[in-house]
């Protein structure tokens, strides 16, 4: 056991022992090269954004398909949107949802960097555009950045890095095998402890398609992203970045609809610390390399619905990796709210529970303090069903709270119909000592609304990481 941390409050001195962060090594494993979608080349290199030599900090992703490549995105709603967010949103609006390339740097967020930041983001776009085999629009590259806010990019190093991937360059490393995908995923990382990369194969109407994607994030995680091409007026709360690629052909409008649905049930349903980044972005490219038959929500509704569900499941798998890699996290907790008047209400309550500092510290302490869960639940105002009726009120005599182990053993009710149970504290401790478990809140049949959120605990290691972030 590590040396105790001495916490002094008033006249008392309380020794508190920190716990080791569980290993994440099992979450990073090789994937067969055949599992990746057709028609993409990519790489990750060290351009010099990060201080440590040899650490990847620049990713380049290109679609080489002869078919048009649809693109969709969801961006942060933060008022201080970073330059790459603004630039990429503009490109997607101008192109009507088409793009063939993505360029990503880590180590510098290029956020709150004024005119120079915008010029640097456009420079990254232009240089990557030059690598594309063909173009229909003036600009067909989307850009992402992550790192420290308020610092300018070393743009000359980034430009040199992008140019190193030209066909005529002896240092070109763009490829389509697992190593190339892994290099790109590593270039996304900041405080992440492992590259987050997954793939998925699925079949629609007898045609086999593939999804593959990478994301990054471990801190400054509480996304609230909206669709590309809109002016965001809502302002809410290390950055969440993600890029998903598929060889299906999907119309731009339908791709955006599917992504918006998927993000709400995946990346917008995770929280590490409750802080929304200036750079949060999720991109999807669909290049039609597997089949030229276009999936469209109006023309082929059944195929579209199948694709939407595949994308949602895949996005959730990627999103969960971010929570599992939460800075200093020792727990992965699923928060489920059911019996709410609507999905929106269930999602709002699950979000409040997942971001409560009191709940998250109780998770770290392995303390079944269900009162904190209940307090968070009751603090959320429910939405009125229409403008002429008052919002519904939770019937506290029907609410149930249950701690559900992930190992398949019996759940532990702690509150039943508003009445506290005589909780077996040893059993509660046994469940909460596990790395994975679920908190289930049932509002007692107010409606069919049900939502899940994924969160982690707050540890001393989280404070250490973020106290030292810029040093």
UniProtKB/Swiss-Prot annotation:
Which residue positions are annotated as catalytic? 239 (nucleophile)
Per the UniProt entry, the disulfide pairs are: none
The main location is: mitochondrion
Top-rank taxon: Eukaryota
List the residues marked with site Involved in the stabilization of negative charge on the oxyanion by the formation of the oxyanion hole: 146-147
- Residue(s) at site: Cleavage: 238-239
Query: Which pathway does this polypeptide act in?
Result: Amino-acid biosynthesis; L-arginine biosynthesis; L-ornithine and N-acetyl-L-glutamate from L-glutamate and N(2)-acetyl-L-ornithine (cyclic): step 1/1; Amino-acid biosynthesis; L-arginine biosynthesis; N(2)-acetyl-L-ornithine from L-glutamate: step 1/4
Could you tell me the EC number(s) of this protein? 2.3.1.35, 2.3.1.1
Q: Which amino acid positions bind substrate, per UniProt? A: 190, 216, 239, 327, 466, 471
Gene3D superfamilies recorded for this chain? arginine biosynthesis bifunctional protein suprefamily, ArgJ beta chain, C-terminal domain, L-amino peptidase D-ALA esterase/amidase
Q: Which UniProt keywords apply?
A: Acyltransferase, Amino-acid biosynthesis, Arginine biosynthesis, Autocatalytic cleavage, Mitochondrion, Multifunctional enzyme, Transferase
Q: Name one GO biological process term.
A: L-arginine biosynthetic process
The reaction(s) annotated as catalysed by this protein in its Swiss-Prot or TrEMBL entry are: N(2)-acetyl-L-ornithine + L-glutamate = N-acetyl-L-glutamate + L-ornithine; L-glutamate + acetyl-CoA = N-acetyl-L-glutamate + CoA + H(+)
Q: Where in the cell is it found?
A: Mitochondrion matrix
For this UniProt entry, the molecular function terms from Gene Ontology, in alphabetical order, are:
glutamate N-acetyltransferase activity; L-glutamate N-acetyltransferase activity
List the GO cellular component terms. mitochondrial matrix
Keyword hit for Acyltransferase: yes
Q: How is it modified after translation?
A: The alpha and beta chains are autoproteolytically processed from a single precursor protein within the mitochondrion.
Q: What does this protein do?
A: Catalyzes two activities which are involved in the cyclic version of arginine biosynthesis: the synthesis of acetylglutamate from glutamate and acetyl-CoA, and of ornithine by transacetylation between acetylornithine and glutamate.
By its UniProt entry, which PANTHER family does this protein fall under?
Answer: ARGININE BIOSYNTHESIS BIFUNCTIONAL PROTEIN ARGJ (PTHR23100), ARGININE BIOSYNTHESIS BIFUNCTIONAL PROTEIN ARGJ, MITOCHONDRIAL (PTHR23100:SF0)
Give the family, as the similarity comment puts it. Belongs to the ArgJ family.
Record-linked NCBIfam families: ArgJ (TIGR00120), PRK05388.1 (NF003802)
Q: How does it assemble?
A: Heterodimer of an alpha and a beta chain.
Instruction: Fill in the misc note.
Output: This protein may be expected to contain an N-terminal transit peptide but none has been predicted.
Name under which the protein is recorded: Arginine biosynthesis bifunctional protein ArgJ, mitochondrial
Task: Record the organism.
Answer: Coprinopsis cinerea (strain Okayama-7 / 130 / ATCC MYA-4618 / FGSC 9003)
């Amino acid at each position: 056991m590590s040396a105790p941390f001495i916490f002094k409050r008033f006249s008392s001195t309380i020794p508190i022992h920190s716990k080791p962060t569980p290993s994440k090594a099992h979450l990073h494993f090789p994937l067969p090269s055949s599992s990746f979608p057709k028609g993409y080349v990519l790489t990750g290199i060290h351009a010099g954004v990060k201080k440590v030599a040899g650490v990847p900090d620049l990713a380049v992703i290109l679609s080489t398909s002869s078919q048009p490549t649809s693109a969709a995105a969801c961006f942060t709603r933060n008022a201080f949107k970073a330059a790459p967010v603004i630039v990429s949103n503009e490109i997607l609006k101008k192109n009507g949802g088409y793009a063939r390339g993505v360029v990503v740097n880590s180590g510098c967020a290029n956020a709150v960097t004024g005119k120079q930041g915008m010029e640097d983001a456009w420079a990254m776009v232009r240089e990557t555009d030059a690598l594309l085999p063909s173009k229909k629009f003036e600009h067909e590259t989307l850009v992402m950045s992550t790192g420290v806010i308020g610092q300018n990019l070393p743009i000359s190093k980034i430009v040199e890095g992008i140019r190193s991937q030209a066909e005529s360059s002896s240092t070109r490393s763009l490829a389509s095998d697992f190593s190339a995908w892994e290099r790109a995923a590593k270039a996304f990382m900041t405080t992440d402890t492992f590259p987050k990369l997954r793939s998925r194969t699925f079949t629609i109407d007898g045609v086999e398609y593939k999804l593959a994607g990478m994301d990054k994030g471990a801190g400054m995680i509480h996304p609230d992203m909206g669709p590309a091409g809109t002016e965001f007026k809502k302002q809410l709360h290390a950055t969440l970045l993600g890029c998903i690629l598929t060889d299906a052909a999907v119309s731009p409008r339908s791709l955006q609809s599917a992504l918006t649905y998927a993000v709400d049930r995946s990346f917008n349903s995770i929280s590490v610390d409750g802080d929304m980044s200036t750079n949060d972005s999720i991109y999807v490219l669909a290049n039609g390399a597997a089949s030229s038959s276009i999936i469209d929500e109006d023309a082929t509704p059944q195929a579209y619905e199948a694709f939407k569900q595949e994308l949602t499941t895949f996005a959730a798998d990627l999103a969960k990796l971010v929570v599992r890699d939460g800075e200093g996290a020792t727990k992965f907790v699923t928060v489920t709210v059911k019996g709410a008047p609507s999905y929106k209400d269930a999602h709002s309550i699950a979000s409040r529970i997942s971001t409560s500092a009191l709940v998250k510290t109780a998770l770290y302490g392995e303390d079944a303090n269900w009162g904190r869960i209940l307090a968070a639940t009751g603090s959320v105002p429910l939405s009125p069903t229409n403008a002429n009726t008052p919002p519904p009120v939770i019937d506290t005599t029907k609410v149930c709270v249950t701690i559900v182990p992930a190992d398949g053993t019996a759940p532990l009710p702690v509150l039943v119909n508003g009445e506290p149970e005589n909780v077996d504290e040893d059993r509660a401790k046994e469940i909460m000592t596990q790395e994975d478990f679920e908190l289930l809140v049932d509002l007692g049949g107010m409606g069919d609304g049900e939502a899940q959120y994924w969160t982690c605990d707050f540890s001393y290691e989280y404070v250490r990481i973020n106290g030292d972030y810029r040093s």
